[in-house]
Amino acid sequence: MLGLFRKLLPREDRFFDLFADHSRTVMGAAEALNALLAGGPDIESHCDRIVALENEADEITREVLLAVRRSFITPFDRGDIKDLIQSMDDAIDMMHKTVKTIRLYEQKSFDPGMQAMGAAVVEAAHLVAEAIPLLSRIGANAHRLSAIAEEVTHVEDRSDQLHEQGLKDLFQRHGASNPMAYIIGSEIYGELEKVVDRFEDVANEISGIVIENV
């Protein structure tokens, strides 16, 4: 009877399938955000894609949290699973918030610094996408997982510099002559910086999981 009951519950490896699915939505949204920041006629389609992927990511997050409650066995601590998936979801939520700002102010072109930050978002998303499947064998992959977390931190450091330089450039161009352009630009820069910050949060969660399980 117990064996039959266990078969009805989520498998341990189901968590890694869900993590991978969520990571793919985050990666897709990062690539769409980067393409959006290039400007051009397809801005709205890129915005729509990010919104759709964010909705998909929310559904996956709910599946993970439900599986945590229903499972006898989890691959690592339940709290760590919850914190990991929610940190990943926060990253795509922040991309969605950036889209809302871009649509609100009807922005059609973006500064080179914003485009560079879009590339940083893609780089961070790629690193997280590499890390997620490695969590299925933490001991064997501990060194690479730690290295990935460090690489994400470096990406975030570069993003900080791009953010600061972007605000400076905006002020020099618009600070006195067009305050509204400065306000809008600084808001977009700030939200892009927060996207990269959320990826650093994911990296920190991964580092914590490695420390607790090796």
From Swiss-Prot:
Domain of life according to the entry: Bacteria
InterPro entries referenced in this protein's UniProt entry, alphabetically: PhoU-like_sf (IPR038078), Put_Phosphate_transp_reg (IPR018445), UPF0111_domain (IPR052912)
Pfam families: PhoU_div
Database matches in SUPFAM superfamilies: PhoU-like (SSF109755)
UniProt similarity note: Belongs to the UPF0111 family.
Record function comment: Could be involved in orthophosphate transport.
Protein name per UniProt: Putative pit accessory protein
Organism of derivation: Rhizobium meliloti (strain 1021) (Ensifer meliloti)
Lineage, broadest ranks: Bacteria, Pseudomonadati, Pseudomonadota, Alphaproteobacteria, Hyphomicrobiales
